[in-house]
Amino acid sequence: MSSLDEDEEDFEMLDTENLQFMGKKMFGKQAGEDESDDFAIGGSTPTNKLKFYPYSNNKLTRSTGTLNLSLSNTALSEANSKFLGKIEEEEEEEEEGKDEESVDSRIKRWSPFHENESVTTPITKRSAEKTNSPISLKQWNQRWFPKNDARTENTSSSSSYSVAKPNQSAFTSSGLVSKMSMDTSLYPAKLRIPETPVKKSPLVEGRDHKHVHLSSSKNASSSLSVSPLNFVEDNNLQEDLLFSDSPSSKALPSIHVPTIDSSPLSEAKYHAHDRHNNQTNILSPTNSLVTNSSPQTLHSNKFKKIKRARNSVILKNRELTNSLQQFKDDLYGTDENFPPPIIISSHHSTRKNPQPYQFRGRYDNDTDEEISTPTRRKSIIGATSQTHRESRPLSLSSAIVTNTTSAETHSISSTDSSPLNSKRRLISSNKLSANPDSHLFEKFTNVHSIGKGQFSTVYQVTFAQTNKKYAIKAIKPNKYNSLKRILLEIKILNEVTNQITMDQEGKEYIIDYISSWKFQNSYYIMTELCENGNLDGFLQEQVIAKKKRLEDWRIWKIIVELSLALRFIHDSCHIVHLDLKPANVMITFEGNLKLGDFGMATHLPLEDKSFENEGDREYIAPEIISDCTYDYKADIFSLGLMIVEIAANVVLPDNGNAWHKLRSGDLSDAGRLSSTDIHSESLFSDITKVDTNDLFDFERDNISGNSNNAGTSTVHNNSNINNPNMNNGNDNNNVNTAATKNRLILHKSSKIPAWVPKFLIDGESLERIVRWMIEPNYERRPTANQILQTEECLYVEMTRNAGAIIQEDDFGPKPKFFI
């Protein structure tokens, strides 16, 4: 065929395609086409050549041509494209003369994309197919793009739903959380050592601890095995704190300490000590030990010498033994009758203007002992010479409240004339002034922290003159704890301690107030020290840590002692506590309870209508929050929640649904308050464990007269508690099981003495009195006196022989009228 004929055929083909295109445009779209096909190019004639058409307004012309370019490039290697090599193709033989229907069906069956991959241009092995047909492209778009769009919409909707979907667990009421199931790490560890920021010297850590507080360890005994406050702290910590704070201590290693043999002054003092033994107020029992030390040992073990000197201050003032009898007179209104301060004359003094003498504790004695002769005489306030001995005893409060301004007339002993001593005292006083609590080291010994609250810090101290331990609460006013509240607390403590009424019963369950003073911007309240810590620490260490519960007898004793304390402050002092919780209930050496921390307390009726004192939300009464109503019965409500916490071993909530349920009188989340297993580890207890719930149910069923049905009902009711796997059906097996269980209960009941009162084994009396105490309407709650007048409390108070936390077997001691 000639070239002319070929050109004519090509022209006819092009003309045919144009006519088809114009025909579509004139007569409308075919069935199944949309508006996007109006400008489709290419018709149905197979072609593999790039063609340009003179339609400038056709937007798909260039894109279709570009598609033709990519389809015609069959030589492109799969390695050059990360998408081309992943397309799956069907390996089929190409048949000649395949019509348009077969191509469309193949496109419908072809899945060239993997999941989660973007759409790419399909590559086939065909070199000339109807791949640029508008119908094929339309079907291609309809098959794949709607699915991808739908997938994108679903993904976006699900992601937005997951973000906006609330946490469903927030609507689930979990109730009260048992302390048994909680990790012990959630509870704060008891403070065993003082929080001292000073780094200890390695020489101090290697010292011998055999002679530390031998006298105090003899008296350190308790009915409890472990007590937070009875823990004997390492006395070296306070010594390190004060000794290391002084910058002059860095120069101490280079100072030569003269021996006793080479010091004329020490020899004179040593012989003078033998001649005037009855004229001195302080005697050092360790002088003989230090005298026998060699110079090398004395110099290398200087830290040990400080320790010996610390224990060497022993007062021989016999008048101090009578100071406790006259303490109240000396503390309130009799200080002005004291004679003028005594001037201690000293012929060794070389100072022209002696500085005022201050009451010095272990700190001054230790530092002076470090660089001076060990046999020198020490002097503290109240220690007089033979010619100036006074017959009036020295009061405890006057020694404590002594300030630097009021002691200007006292003289310093002769050994304080050293320039280095004066420099050390000046530097140390500047450092101590930075922390007001540091002045306690000058007035007391063995000072260490035993607790820290939101507004205060509590220290345990020892008064050197009487060797008696006290607790000092340091409070610094701030915007959350005003000065007015601090002064009110001191006033209330003073009033409660000195309250003289006809009925003094219950006063022994209130913390004893000793003294108070102000130093710089802080206030200090001195009270008696309860060696066994507080009730909260006892519950954590002796109950929760051992995975057990208190028996009902001790719980009733706690109710009795705290009710006695509340009745005294309510009826005799007209004071409401408003912050009753286990952390504010102290435990004495004998195991009795004492109510302390009157920081939220106030007098009733209120004088200030704007008064707003709220304790912890876990124990606060509902009327205080809702109506700002303050009544004595708010303390009764707090006592009731304390018993719920102690008896059920649960953590009281501070908000939420469980919080509101407790304030509506609902105890369903707490479970049974009476212990279902009252067997204890006491030496007087039998090996057999007694389930008081089964015993009470058995007695109740016998009274009903229908032992079989009632026995079956009893087993059914208690199946969740005693035997969760028991079948709850009503067949003969259950009747036999109930009879067997009743016989077992009879065997167990024989282990319970006949004199045991019913309220200790019925499982209902404790819950009944707790519901009475947490009555939502405060007017229906009992008073402290009404609680004490119940039969249960009268029996407990009449028969108990020990403190509230002391175990007295499972059911308490046997009453004397049964003996």
Curated annotation (Swiss-Prot):
<protein>
    <recommendedName>
        <fullName>Mitosis inhibitor protein kinase SWE1</fullName>
        <ecNumber>2.7.11.1</ecNumber>
    </recommendedName>
</protein>
<feature type="region of interest" description="Disordered">
    <location>
        <begin position="707"/>
        <end position="736"/>
    </location>
</feature>
<dbReference type="GO" id="GO:0090154">
    <property type="term" value="P:positive regulation of sphingolipid biosynthetic process"/>
</dbReference>
<feature type="region of interest" description="Disordered">
    <location>
        <begin position="341"/>
        <end position="395"/>
    </location>
</feature>
<keyword id="KW-0808">Transferase</keyword>
<feature type="region of interest" description="Disordered">
    <location>
        <begin position="86"/>
        <end position="105"/>
    </location>
</feature>
<keyword id="KW-0479">Metal-binding</keyword>
<keyword id="KW-0418">Kinase</keyword>
<feature type="compositionally biased region" description="Polar residues">
    <location>
        <begin position="118"/>
        <end position="142"/>
    </location>
</feature>
<feature type="modified residue" description="Phosphoserine; by CDC5, CDC28 and CLA4">
    <location>
        <position position="111"/>
    </location>
</feature>
<dbReference type="GO" id="GO:0000320">
    <property type="term" value="P:re-entry into mitotic cell cycle"/>
</dbReference>
<keyword id="KW-0832">Ubl conjugation</keyword>
<feature type="modified residue" description="Phosphoserine; by CDC5">
    <location>
        <position position="102"/>
    </location>
</feature>
<comment type="subunit">
    <text>Interacts with CLB2-CDC28. Partial hyperphosphorylation of SWE1 by CLB2-CDC28 stabilizes the ternary complex of SWE1 and CLB2-CDC28 and stimulates kinase activity of SWE1 in a positive feedback loop, maintaining CLB2-CDC28 in the tyrosine-phosphorylated state. Fully hyperphosphorylated SWE1 dissociates from CLB2-CDC28. Interacts with HSL7, KCC4 and MET30.</text>
</comment>
<dbReference type="GO" id="GO:0106310">
    <property type="term" value="F:protein serine kinase activity"/>
</dbReference>
<dbReference type="GO" id="GO:0005737">
    <property type="term" value="C:cytoplasm"/>
</dbReference>
<keyword id="KW-0132">Cell division</keyword>
<feature type="modified residue" description="Phosphoserine; by CDC5">
    <location>
        <position position="169"/>
    </location>
</feature>
<dbReference type="GO" id="GO:0040020">
    <property type="term" value="P:regulation of meiotic nuclear division"/>
</dbReference>
<dbReference type="GO" id="GO:0051301">
    <property type="term" value="P:cell division"/>
</dbReference>
<feature type="modified residue" description="Phosphoserine; by CDC28">
    <location>
        <position position="105"/>
    </location>
</feature>
<keyword id="KW-0460">Magnesium</keyword>
<keyword id="KW-0539">Nucleus</keyword>
<dbReference type="GO" id="GO:0046872">
    <property type="term" value="F:metal ion binding"/>
</dbReference>
<dbReference type="GO" id="GO:0004713">
    <property type="term" value="F:protein tyrosine kinase activity"/>
</dbReference>
<feature type="binding site">
    <location>
        <position position="597"/>
    </location>
    <ligand>
        <name>Mg(2+)</name>
    </ligand>
</feature>
<feature type="modified residue" description="Phosphoserine; by CDC5 and CLA4">
    <location>
        <position position="395"/>
    </location>
</feature>
<dbReference type="InterPro" id="IPR008271">
    <property type="entry name" value="Ser/Thr_kinase_AS"/>
</dbReference>
<comment type="function">
    <text>Protein kinase that acts as a negative regulator of entry into mitosis (G2 to M transition) by phosphorylating and inhibiting the mitosis-promoting cyclin B-bound CDC28 at 'Tyr-19'. SWE1-mediated inhibition of CDC28 acts in a cell size or morphogenesis checkpoint to delay mitosis in response to defects in growth, actin organization or bud formation. Inhibits the activity of B-type cyclins in replication initiation strongly for CLB2, moderately for CLB3 and CLB4, and there is no apparent inhibition for CLB5 and CLB6, correlating with the normal expression timing of those cyclins.</text>
</comment>
<feature type="active site" description="Proton acceptor">
    <location>
        <position position="579"/>
    </location>
</feature>
<dbReference type="GO" id="GO:0051321">
    <property type="term" value="P:meiotic cell cycle"/>
</dbReference>
<keyword id="KW-0469">Meiosis</keyword>
<feature type="modified residue" description="Phosphothreonine; by CDC5">
    <location>
        <position position="629"/>
    </location>
</feature>
<feature type="modified residue" description="Phosphoserine">
    <location>
        <position position="284"/>
    </location>
</feature>
<dbReference type="GO" id="GO:0005524">
    <property type="term" value="F:ATP binding"/>
</dbReference>
<dbReference type="GO" id="GO:0010697">
    <property type="term" value="P:negative regulation of mitotic spindle pole body separation"/>
</dbReference>
<dbReference type="GO" id="GO:0005634">
    <property type="term" value="C:nucleus"/>
</dbReference>
<feature type="compositionally biased region" description="Acidic residues">
    <location>
        <begin position="88"/>
        <end position="102"/>
    </location>
</feature>
<feature type="modified residue" description="Phosphothreonine; by CDC28">
    <location>
        <position position="384"/>
    </location>
</feature>
<feature type="binding site">
    <location>
        <position position="473"/>
    </location>
    <ligand>
        <name>ATP</name>
    </ligand>
</feature>
<keyword id="KW-0547">Nucleotide-binding</keyword>
<feature type="region of interest" description="Disordered">
    <location>
        <begin position="278"/>
        <end position="297"/>
    </location>
</feature>
